[in-house]
Structures are given as C-alpha cells and as structure tokens.
UniProtKB/Swiss-Prot annotation:
Induction: Transiently increased in rapidly dividing Schwann cells in response to sciatic nerve transection 2 days post-injury. The keyword Transcription regulation applies. Keywords: Activator, DNA-binding, Homeobox, Nucleus, Repressor, Transcription, Transcription regulation. The gene is Pou3f1. It comes from Rattus norvegicus. This is POU domain, class 3, transcription factor 1.
Length: 451
C-alpha cells in the first residue's frame, strides 16, 4: 500500500487527487537535490566573488577607496536600486533586491545589469593607471551612476564628493571627467600607497596646467607623492627671472665694503661730502646733496638708491685717481662746486655804526638800508642780512615773558619797591630819580594815590 501511494500523482496543492504528472520519488528527490546544489553552488560562487572583491578592495589600496586602479567599464542605466554592477561572470546571478535587472532597463530593477557600456571618461583616466591590474578588479567596484536610494555602500562616490566637489556620483570615472585635473593628485597619492608602484606609476596628463596644480593642492594639500610630480616646472619661470635680475645688483656686503672704502679715500683726498655731490653734478650731470653722500657712507639709503649711486661714486674715484691728486685739478673740482659766497667779515668800527643804528631802528626800510650801505661802503645785501641776523639774536637773548624788558631786580633796588612789594612806577616808566628825590616823591604821591 505504501508503494502504491508513492506513485500517486501530486497536484499543485499537494493532495493525491492532483492533476500533475507522475514522478518517481527517487527522481523527484534527485531533482530537488540538484536544484538545491545548484542554488548552493551559485550562492557560494557569488559569496566567493564578493569575498574576492572585498579582499582586493581592502588589500590593493590598504583600505583607501581610491587605491584601486580605475574601472574602465561602468554599468549603463540610472536605476534607483543602487546595487553594484555585475561583471560578465555574474550576468546569471540573483538579483540583490529581488528581480533580475535588464540591460536596457532605465530604472526599477535592483539586480545586476546584463550589459556593460564602456564610458568615455575612462579614456581620460587611462593615462593615470597604465598597469595590468585593472582587469582583475572588474566593474564591480564602481557604483551605478544614477543610483539614488540603494542600500549598498558607495565608498567611491562618497570619497569623490567629499574630496573632490567637482566629481559627480559616477564613481572614479565621474571624478576624472567632471573634476578635471583635480582628481589626479588624489589618485596618484592612493596609487603610491598601493604595493604596485612599479606597474601603476602615473604620468600627469599634458592638459594639466596651473589650474590643475592649484586645484590638486587645494583639495589634497600635503600629498607628498602628488607634490613630488606636480611641483617641477610650476613656478620656475618667475624664479629664473628674479635670479637674472639679481645677478647685476651688488650684495649688501659689497655695498657696505665700498661705502667704507669710499669714505676713507674721500677723506684722504681732502674732499668734503658736499664737494663730492657737486663734483658728480659737474662731471656726470647728476647733482647730489651733502646729505645724500652722508647717508650713503652711513648706509642709510635704500638698497635701490645705494645700487644706483655706487657706480657714480666709483667712477668719480677713478677720475680723481687718474688726476694723480694734483692741486690744480682738486681746486678746479672744488671751484666748480656750489655757488656759495664767501663769509663777510665786518670791521669793528662798521659794526659799531650798525649797532647804534639798530638801537634807533631795529627794522629799517629798504631806503634806509641803501643809505646806510652807501655811507659804510658795504653792499646792500650785506647790510640787510646783518639786520636780519641781529633781530634774530635779540629774540634769542630776550626772554619771552619779559616782553623785551630786563628783569625788575636789575633796574630797581630792593628798597625802591613800594609797601606792597610792587613797583612805585609802571614798568614802562623812565629810570627813577635819585633815592632822595624818590623818597620825597613817595611822601607826596602815595597819600594822593590812596585817596
């Protein structure tokens, strides 16, 4: 009876009255075992692939998401599932979200895509990674370009958005396409961290200019590997120009040594600083004041002015040495100097006459100065300057508080002051009479002044 029951057909509901085909129990068990083994084999293979990808993901770049060589193949479509794209060996794999995705499906499918399209942006990244390690990574390391709400992690996309704002959500290819040269330094640094430096030695693309350098350093400053390759030639032109301009200029030590030697030779030759400045104006057309020569010897001029004045002074020294120090040449150079008049010396008698006239009129008019100059046989300018100097001397000698009058103690004796300690006469009054008359005057004027 049991044997007969085994051959009863099984319907869809599992009852004995079903209309399904007859199946031997052993065949059914074998088919079920084969299906289970196939599912187990497929799951194990998928897990092995995941384990291999995870191992390569962490091992190749030492945990760095951009340490991997860039994937040259990216999945098509912008599905919202956000699953990782499958390689050619995973086209038959089970869907991560439940349904198998199609190659031409624009969205909705959460499974692996069946068709892969080569992205044009990968060509731009080919210059950065020319080694042979890209083939074993597969496209599974790159998330879907348009993935919006997937549950799978997307380290490449996140790293691209965090480190390089110019990169899109399209993974490393998006970074290379949208970020331009900015993705180069970060990738270069990650590749140097990898153990495949011999195979993945990148060379900067030719279109990387100053903008690329600045962009790379702004987002990946401190990346020594990138800086070692991107810095050469970045600013060599300016430094060469600066070095070329500094070749002709003397150093500060040379200027200091020349100023010291110039001062010693000038003093030995018997020239003053003013003579040197005027001689430069006479010989070369550049007139310099005594203050300028003094500041040059004291190293108080600016570096630029010191460099301009040094060749002129050096040439003047050569001209002076070539003259063999003859007195005629030295006097000629000194005579060609400033047009200053000699100092006038006034005789004692003439000076007394001027003093007496000054007491009468400290500030004479032009007509009076002319008459006085004619009478004393002096030049009109000499008389005018003498009166100016005499007035300045009077101002220095007279205190400002006294308003041009001597102190009270020098004019009046202590007994000649009034009872209150003040003067009996105003300060502008003429000198007082003798003591007896003053005493009598006090007796007669004080009562009247009190009344």
């Amino acid at each position: 009876m049991a044997t007969t029951a085994q051959y009863l057909p099984r319907g869809p509901g599992g009852g004995a009255g079903g209309t399904g085909p007859l199946m031997h129990p052993d065949a059914a068990a074998a088919a079920a075992a084969a299906a289970a083994a196939e599912r187990l084999h497929a799951g194990a293979a998928y897990r092995e692939v995941q384990k291999l990808m995870h191992h390569e993901w962490l091992g190749a770049g030492a945990g760095h998401p951009v340490g991997l060589a860039h994937p040259q193949w990216l999945p098509t479509g912008g599905g919202g599932g956000g699953d990782w794209a499958g390689g050619p060996h995973l086209e038959h794999g089970k869907a991560g979200g439940g349904s198998t995705g199609r190659a031409d499906d624009g969205g909705g499918g959460g499974g692996f895509h069946a068709r892969l399209v080569h992205q044009g942006a990968a060509h731009a990244g080919a210059a950065w990674a020319q080694g042979g390690t890209a083939h074993h990574l597969g496209p599974a390391m790159s998330p879907s370009p348009g993935a919006g709400g997937g549950h799978q992690p997307q380290p490449l996309g996140l790293y691209a958005q965090a480190a390089y704002p110019g990169g899109g959500g399209g993974g490393l290819a998006g970074m290379l396409a949208a970020g331009g040269g900015g993705a180069g330094p970060g990738l270069h640094h990650a590749l140097h961290e990898d153990g495949h430096e011999a195979q993945l030695e990148p060379s900067p693309p030719p279109h990387l200019g100053a903008h690329g350098h600045a962009h790379g350093h702004a987002h990946a400053g401190g990346l020594h590997a990138a800086a070692a390759h991107l810095h050469p030639g970045a600013g060599g032109g300016g430094s060469s120009v600066g070095e070329h301009s500094d070749e002709d200029a003397p150093s500060s030590d040379d200027l200091e040594q020349f100023a010291k030697q110039f001062k010693q030779r000038r003093i030995k030759l018997g020239f003053t600083q003013a003579d040197v400045g005027l001689a430069l104006g006479t010989l070369y057309g550049n007139v310099f004041s005594q203050t300028t020569i003094c500041r040059f010897e004291a190293l108080q001029l600016s570096f630029k002015n010191m460099c301009k004045l040094k060749p002129l002074l050096n040439k003047w020294l050569e001209e002076t040495d070539s003259s063999s120090g003859s007195p005629t040449n030295l006097d000629k150079i000194a005579a060609q100097g400033r047009k200053r008049k000699k100092r006038t010396s006034i005789e004692v008698g003439v000076k007394g006459a001027l003093e007496s006239h000054f007491l009468k009129c400290p500030k004479p008019s032009a007509h009076e100065i002319t008459g006085l100059a004619d009478s004393l046989q002096l030049e009109k300018e000499v008389v005018r300057v003498w009166f100016c100097n005499r007035r300045q001397k009077e101002k220095r000698m007279t205190p400002a508080a006294g308003a041009g009058h001597p102190p009270m103690d020098d004019v009046y004796a202590p007994g000649e002051l009034g009872p209150g300690g003040g003067s009996a006469s105003p300060p502008s009054a003429p000198p007082p009479p003798p003591p007896a008359a003053l005493h009598h005057h006090h007796h007669h004027t004080l009562p009247g002044s009190v009344q």
